[in-house]
Amino acid sequence: LYLLVGTFALGAVGLAQAAGFNLSPQCPPSFERTDVGVCRLRSMYQTYTRIEGHGGVQMALPPARDGFTPQQIDLGRHLFFDPLLSGDRKSSCAHCHHPDHGLADGRATGAGFGAEGFGPERRGGVALPRRTPTLWNVAYATRLFWDGRATTLEEQASGPLFSPQEMGNSAERLTQDLNANTSYRQLFAQAFARSEDKAITLNEVTGALAAFESTLISLNSRYDRYAHGDRKAMSAREVQGMNVFRGFVARCTQCHTPPLFTNHELAVVGAPPPAKGQPIDEGAGAITHDPLLRGAFKVPTLRNITKTGPRYFNAGQLGSLDEVVAFYNAARGHALPKGEKQALHWHVHMMKPKLSDDDAKAIVAFLGALEDETMSPQPPAAVPSGLPVVPVRAAPH
């Protein structure tokens, strides 16, 4: 069952502007409004001080990107769901980072500019070479995109907006469209505490998107409740998988380090080509020209990994989490084409750990305990452009 929201039509001379918008003065759940009016995340993890080690529970979190006002966050939410941000006015950020699909799209690789629809059913348009990354916990990210080319949420936001292959817009047209919209001029003035007479800037646009994305936090899974002391939160099978996951043989936590289940580093794991007969994706090596980073990709978070399938790896080469575990259980470089040379990661877990079938399946069971979508964003009822808002599943009551 889907909830359709924001069904406004195009006018004869342009977009019909929707009226009556106001930004929420409240911080999102799990955020607290401070005395200076900004929202700060509050989590049990902030009470922990241990930062060393890879497999332990009750580990401290790294610094997060927060400190935005409620109005800036809510403005970012409206922008995130507004197709006005794309060059053809067909796709919003949410069409590819959809709440129903783990803030990704459920496709093997993304469908870019000109595509229709959302999620796994998105069709047509530019065929993108990589999977759409999830946005869960990007507030903690120090590298963004599969190749790690962005270091801030603002930089990440501007990448797809102005890529001809993705959203196909330009900075000039985007700011022109926003400034021509009375409602957006009012909302930006609210969010940034300034006069409506001042023109909307690109920095304000990417800043608002960063504010919203900083609230996409997933830290309340059954694993988290177990880590905080509730030993009944996970099943015996999941606890077995956790112990294999963090144990000496598998050492998954060397890269997928709790509590974020990523270390945000670039890793060369010998990923197979995107498809049989195709050349490998050089990853970070293509932009750094460093031979040691040929085939390197950012270590993805495993939070909500069960929600972002069914395809995995940088180009959806693997079709299940069982296949992913089997990949790491095999010999180093086994999936690389003959003659392909890569500086493979040296960790012990890349040396064919020889996990039993039972232990491998237990790891997959444990990954299900990392599900938490309690802070999944809800779309606005309408957006200032008047364009249709992408449908989302009706929230269960």
Regions found by a protein language model. Give the residues of each.
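Periplasmic c-type cytochrome electron-transfer domains
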Residues: 2, 14-397
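Core hydrophobic alpha-helical transmembrane segments of single-pass membrane proteins
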Residues: 7-12
